[in-house]
Regions:
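Active-site rim/loop-helix segments in enzyme catalytic domains that contact anionic ligands
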Residues: 1
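Active-site cores that bind ATP or allylic diphosphates and position pyrophosphate for catalysis
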Residues: 4-323
Length: 323
């Protein structure tokens, strides 16, 4: 399965919520995720604090953001106010943040966390056979050997595809920023006061993605939020257009296919299950989300210099193992 693009390009809270909703609707009994903490009780405690004190935390965060603090830093201070500095420090690490959001959203399944070891989330170095996704992308773009870091089949797939370089992505972003009007870009969910205008004024002056992101970044807007904002601008994701979550099947076994068929018949799954993106009778409540998936795929194919028809979401069907 995949998380729909609208949620994949969203905040940790929305990303986690969409993922958990998909898994629980599919009947998952356990949900496993990585964290720097590796301590499920520790993560559960922070989750409980956030669930039990939403009004107090939200008011504190709003106040601190008005003072110029970023959302992540304001949230840490809000938790510190309730639990003390030691516990709140958990939210300084990116995978702990996501883990806490998973814990907040899980209703039925049993959560399990695996302690992350080796390089950090955004580290572009590798240690032995351990590397972050950022490091693998960096090494691939540098034409370095990634064999020890990936399963053999994954390496074959990556080596066949032209990597999406930051330069290509940056050029596409610049075109979008120059051609879109500020009112359109203001609708990006991760946007903020003056950010769209600053983007439009900066693209002619910046020479790389890092240069652009650093120009837009501020005490209030973190690099992570800027990266989300830029992706949302490129994909014209509109905060005012609602889409429901749905389950997009990418691959399955024959046994999995039979399970999905029984799940649909039972009515236990409340989300739409999609195996064919070209169907014209998709429910109205998910059409916008699907349209962003298709656009994201088309842009990716352009950036990878792949055949636009052959690799189109309209043409590709789920991979069935064993066939």
């Amino acid at each position: 399965m995949e998380i729909p693009t609208v949620f994949a390009c969203s905040s940790a809270q929305n990303f986690a919520g969409a993922g958990v909703e998909i898994l629980e609707n599919l009947g998952a009994d356990y949900i496993s995720f990585g964290s720097e903490s590796g301590n499920i009780e520790e993560l559960a405690e922070i989750s409980r604090v956030m669930e039990q004190n939403p009004r107090e935390i939200d008011e504190f965060i709003r106040l601190k953001i008005k003072e110029g603090l970023s959302y992540p830093r304001a949230r840490i201070q809000a938790i510190e106010m309730i639990t003390g500095e030691e516990q709140a420090g958990i939210l300084d690490s990116p995978n702990n943040i996501l883990a806490v959001e998973y814990m907040r959203k899980i209703k039925r399944a049993v959560p399990i966390t695996v302690k992350r070891t080796g390089p950090g989330y955004n580290d572009v170095t590798a240690e032995g056979e351990l590397a972050s996704a950022s490091a693998i992308r960096y090494l691939l773009n540098e034409n370095r050997d990634i064999s020890p870091l990936l399963p053999g089949e994954s390496k074959k797939i990556l080596m066949k595809a032209a990597p999406v370089s930051e330069e290509k992505y940056f050029n596409m972003l610049c075109y979008r920023a120059l051609s879109a009007d500020i009112a359109q870009m203001d609708k990006a969910p991760a946007g903020g006061e003056g950010l769209s205008n600053k983007l439009k004024n900066s693209v002619r002056l910046c020479r790389s993605l890092d240069d652009l992101a650093d120009t837009l970044k501020s005490k209030r807007y973190t690099r992570t939020r800027i990266d989300r904002f830029l992706a949302q601008v490129l994909l014209a994701i509109d905060r005012d257009v609602h889409t429901e979550n749905y389950i997009r099947i990418l691959a399955l076994s024959k046994k999995g296919g039979a399970y999905l068929k029984d799940l649909k018949k039972s009515g236990a799954c409340e989300l739409t299950i999609i195996t064919n993106m070209s169907k014209e009778n998709l429910p109205e409540e998910i059409r916008y989300g699907v349209s962003r998936d298709i656009l994201a795929s088309d842009i990716y194919n352009l950036l990878c210099e792949r055949d636009m028809y052959r690799f189109s979401e309209y043409v590709r069907k789920p991979f069935i193992a064993g066939e």
